[in-house]
């Protein structure tokens, strides 16, 4: 699995929190039987910081199990979350193999299995395995901010559609879990959990980025340009021209970017 550094995670956290569906999070929280939560690809603990206010007091002291490939991110999470009520446990795990037999079921005993910005990176096989492990444990699930392929930029540029299409092709490259689901991930997850008897709900959770998020916009534009050139080297000049103009819009305070995401919650009756 490709890593994400702490600076990037901190940069996106405020936009993530604004975009997420509070209604969907509240709906799944109301259905929890306890407060044991498994957070997959937890990074520095942003998911905990978002979710903690939704857990009902009658569930008891929360127990958070944060799992990630990167021990350094987990160490930072432990520091940032050290004053939280309840138990915060971190565990460095190779997530690409964590669901394969004979590995123990990470989901066992967990009231909620959750992740943020993960599902579009994983493969059909991995996500099917996760759905099976969650069903075996009868865990509710909440998956936030799954990229759905939507990118809209204004002011418009002639290459916007080309870059978006190249980025979406790049999203399907193996990210360490096998061929990535990319923009198809949320729909595939809905089918996988429904097939196992889950009630599934989805809500949009788009990033709406304006002049209050210039650095995040800059990082996105540069990352998208790199991805587009990796897929189509012959388009390097066009992509670089697009990048220069898009960054100029950001610098001038006139750039608006919408990035499509979906939140998904599911539970067993």
Residue ranges and their predicted role:
Residues 35-43:
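Conserved class I S-adenosyl-L-methionine
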Residues 107, 199-269:
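Conserved Class I S-adenosyl-L-methionine
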Residues 1-32:
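Class I SAM-dependent methyltransferase Rossmann-like catalytic core
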Residues 114:
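A conserved beta-strand element that flanks and buttresses the S-adenosyl-L-methionine
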Residues 45-98:
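Class I SAM-dependent methyltransferase SAM/SAH-binding core
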Residues 98-108:
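Short amphipathic alpha-helix with an adjacent loop that forms part of the alpha/beta core around
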Residues 139-204:
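Conserved catalytic/acceptor-binding region of the Class I
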Residues 121-134:
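A short, conserved alpha-helix within the catalytic core of class I
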């Amino acid at each position: 699995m490709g890593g994400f550094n702490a600076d990037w995670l901190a940069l996106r956290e405020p936009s993530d929190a604004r975009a997420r569906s509070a209604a969907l999070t509240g709906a799944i929280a109301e259905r929890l039987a306890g407060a044991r939560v498994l957070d997959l690809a937890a990074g520095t603990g942003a998911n905990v910081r978002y979710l903690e206010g939704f857990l009902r007091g009658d569930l008891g002291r929360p127990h958070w199990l944060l799992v990630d490939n990167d021990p350094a991110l987990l160490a930072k999470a432990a520091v940032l979350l050290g004053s939280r009520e309840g138990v915060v446990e971190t565990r460095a795990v190779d997530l690409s193999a964590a669901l394969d037999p004979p590995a123990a079921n990470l989901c066992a005993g967990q009231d909620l299995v959750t992740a943020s910005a993960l599902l579009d990176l994983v493969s059909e096989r991995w996500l099917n395995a996760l759905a099976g492990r969650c069903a075996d444990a009868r865990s509710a699930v909440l998956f936030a901010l799954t990229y759905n392929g939507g990118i809209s930029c204004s002011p418009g540029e002639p290459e916007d559609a080309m870059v978006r299409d190249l980025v979406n092709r790049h999203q399907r490259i193996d990210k360490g879990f096998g061929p990535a689901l990319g923009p198809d991930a949320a729909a595939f997850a809905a089918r996988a959990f429904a097939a196992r008897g889950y009630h599934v709900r989805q809500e949009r959770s788009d990033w709406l980025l304006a002049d209050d998020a210039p650095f995040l916009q800059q990082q996105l534009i540069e990352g998208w340009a790199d991805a587009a050139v990796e897929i189509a080297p012959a388009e390097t000049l066009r992509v670089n021209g697009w990048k220069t103009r898009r960054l100029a819009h950001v610098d001038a305070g006139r750039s608006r970017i919408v990035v499509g995401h979906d939140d998904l919650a599911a539970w067993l009756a």
